[in-house]
Amino acid sequence: MELQSSEIRNAQAHFFTQVFSFTSMSSLKCAVQLGIPDAIHSHGKPMALSDLTNSLPINPSKAPYIYRLMRILVAAGYFSEEEKNVYSLTPFTRLLLKNDPLNSISMVLGVNQIAELKAWNAMSEWFQNEDLTAFETAHGKNFWDFGAEDKYGKNFDGVMAADSILVSKMLIPEFNYLFEGLDSLVDVGGGTGTIAKAIAKSFPDLKCTVFDLPHVVANLESTENLEFVGGDMFEKIPSANAILLKWILHDWKDEECVKVLKMCRKAIPEKEKGGKVILIETVLMDSKKHENEEAVKAQISSDIDMMVFFTAKERTEEEWATLFREAGFSGYKIFPMIDFRSPIEVYP
């Protein structure tokens, strides 16, 4: 069927938008590095282009280009243009203020690293070779080995910590009942303890343990109801009333997930005694049936990310149910989404 001229025009416009989709995120990274969100916030009111330009640490010869940078940032919805050349923050860019508790700057900078982009650019080569991941094709080693030997690992920890701050701010106020009545909780793969610290603060009588690889928790200071323990979740998990895994299992293949879940099963008491596993994970939705388009896009993007960087994936409810059953659990309950992820209680 021959395309009409209007269809060709629309297709071409859409084509160029998609081909250059990286430009908006690269521009946002530039804005963060230049301190544009903080400059506008510190101004205390919508900020004129001239004032913004004068406040930034740029070479004077580059001043005329700030207008063009702001134009794409406004078009992408990152900033709002109150009137011509007068800018203000949006809820999105408030997440990029250095002193904000929900600061997610490390996430913007982390996903735009050369190491990450190199992996994405190796995807077509990966489809034609025997490597397990495109990341391995790009770097000659898997993600975990690369992260353990390179500063990239610290950047990854920063990205996960930023995500944990966002999750904890929504998880504890809205889903605090998940932790009520517990005497002890182990946060498996809890990194530097961002979520566990928030839980321990909200539930001072709850003994919280952060369990992660020894090099991750080394030199981290324990408190009265929070301690850090090093180890390997594939070998043994410390005992507790409940085990928390936030966005951990999506990094692993089904067989490895079952192994970790079996370790969790051994570490908790029976359901009658309050034993449970709490997951924060994506439950893939049918994009044609769900009205939350942004959440669906985030889930699909996360799934392809798992393909490129890990031998893993995001999962549907049916796929989760299969893993729980194979690991020896009797049931589960999926709660409403926090963002594009949901709390899941799994019962022995």
UniProtKB/Swiss-Prot annotation:
EC number(s) stated in the UniProt entry for this protein: 2.1.1.267
Organism: Catharanthus roseus
Post-translational events: The N-terminus is blocked.
GO biological process: methylation
Binding-site residues, S-adenosyl-L-methionine: 189, 212, 232-233, 246
Function in brief: Methylates myricetin and dihydromyricetin at 2 sites. Inactive towards 16-hydroxytabersonine, the phenylpropanoids 5-hydroxyferulate, caffeate and their CoA-esters, flavones and flavanones possessing 2 or 3 B-ring hydroxyl groups.
Active-site annotation: 250 (proton acceptor)
Coiled-coil regions, chain positions: none
Protein name: Myricetin O-methyltransferase
